Design a protein with these regions (language model features):
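Mixed-charge (Asp/Glu-Lys/Arg
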Residues: 1-34, 40-148
Length: 148
């Protein structure tokens, strides 16, 4: 039986793939052992996508947030610290709020350890715009065009 955390993660990956397939040439779901969760092909360029999904609310100073941690669940062989993603592992993070069915795309940044977004701000999010902005920051790619 699959645990709930794994189900939330897989649901997020499939939701991200759904959004990406509307605008990009192809999307490949990788296997569990890969550093990236999805490979995205857009305008003849491949991007590695790491999906982070949450189903819970983080409360801080009376406000409600969704929060994502950018560290994989793996530790160094000596258990000294969690391994961090590198630029060779990830091009884009896809941050999924499962309760809203929305995705925020952000380009990889070496300084990011976690990110939180107020729920009310996430509700207003335009997923397509966030993907377009992330791709533009990474590589000045052409505009996204949905299928008809």
């Amino acid at each position: 039986m699959v645990d709930e955390k794994s189900r939330i993660g897989r649901a997020g990956e499939h939701l991200v793939a759904f959004y990406l397939l509307q605008y990009c040439d192809s999307v490949i779901l990788t296997n569990e052992n890969s550093k990236a969760d999805l490979i995205l092909d857009h305008s003849d360029r491949l991007y590695k996508v790491q999906v982070k999904s949450t189903n819970s609310i983080w409360k801080h100073k009376g406000k409600e947030y969704y929060r994502w941690d950018f560290r994989p669940g793996r530790y160094r062989p000596d258990d000294s610290e969690k391994i961090r993603y590198t630029a060779s592992d990830v091009d884009i993070y896809a941050l999924v709020a499962i309760p809203l069915g929305k995705v925020l795309f952000v380009p990889y940044n070496t300084d990011m350890k976690s990110i939180s977004k107020r729920i009310e701000d996430f509700e207003k999010l335009d997923t397509r715009e966030s993907l377009e902005e992330a791709l533009n920051i990474i590589n000045h790619v052409p505009s996204l065009k949905p299928f008809k």
